[in-house]
UniProtKB/Swiss-Prot annotation:
It is a multi-pass membrane protein. This is Cytochrome b. It holds the Pfam family Cytochrome_B. InterPro entries: Cyt_b/b6_C, Cyt_b/b6_C_sf, Cyt_b/b6_N, Cytb/b6-like_sf, Cytochrome_b, Cytochrome_b_C_euk/bac, Cytochrome_b_N_euk/bac, Di-haem_cyt_TM. It comes from Dipodomys venustus (Narrow-faced kangaroo rat). The gene is MT-CYB.
Amino acid sequence: MTILRKTHPLMKMVNHAFIDLPTPANISGWWNFGSLLGLCLIIQIASGLFLAMHYTPDTLTAFSSVTHICRDVNYGWLIRYMHANGASLFFICLYLHIGRGIYYGSYSYTETWNIGIILLFLTMATAFMGYVLPWGQMSFWGATVITNLLSAIPYIGTDLVEWIWGGFSVDKATLNRFFAFHFILPFIIAATAMVHLLFLHETGSNNPLGIPSDCDKIPFHPYYTTKDFLGMVLLLAFFFTMVLFFPDLLGDPDNYSPANPLNTPPHIKPEWYFLFAYAILRSIPNKLGGVIALIMSILVLALLPHIQTSKQRSLMFRPISQFLFWLLVADVLALTWIGGQPVEPPFIIIGQIASLLYFTIILILMPIAGIIENKMLKW
């Protein structure tokens, strides 16, 4: 008798993806973040669904409906803070996942990598629109500033901005459509993640050595299901510590004031996970140039498979590239810090140097390091 999971049409798909999947025997904890991102997405969709039941996307009542959720709905405060901090956790896992991909050369799987970049853009769009919904001061002004960037597009810019706003300023129509998009996008993300997995399972997982592992594979279950489960337990422990003890640590105090179009906050800034891109945007004095740099700060990842010069895939045995990788990590952290600072000396010049360094490391120094390391192999 054949096992049901190997014959049933639906269970067969699950079996090939999560049970009998041949997996490299030596992948480390850095490979846990894919499943952790899945957990984050489930947390966000579940908590978001319950929030949507009580939220009203109207400029007059949006702010008070969020207050009502926190005060009057059973465990509403918990659901709200789970959703807000869940977004931060999502981006922490996302950036670690991308960092792992760069370090171990996972970008060589071009289709998987490119769909990952699309997932990053979708997640950033979802998070931005979600930040607008509570209709606090930073929600309103963040939406105004970021949507206004589209006016930098020549000829059609102004029309495009007014089309997105649904009027001549960020108002009820904008809030309404942002709520609609914020609700539907996570399901599109979930579907795209399935495609991401589909392409990954076509090639199989990479491993820390960056070498083919066909000769040494083990089934995903029970070895990596238990490993993923441990990762999830640790993630949830960290998550609930944040939610229950430091719920506002990563938020902006300005968002506890209702949106006021007549009063501009002293420092308009997005959530912490966009600050590095915001710093790159601000470091260029030209509006269109800044928008192009902002988009390129993410799109530059798509160039990685095409500018790799090294004969080795992973950075594990490449000391120069390792140094440049950690320099890049430090640079992104510096950009994150700068993005949260006011636009005044010395922050302006630090931001410009850090932005220049970001693109220089990825586009120039890393390919050069690869060539040098190839020569070192022959010594």
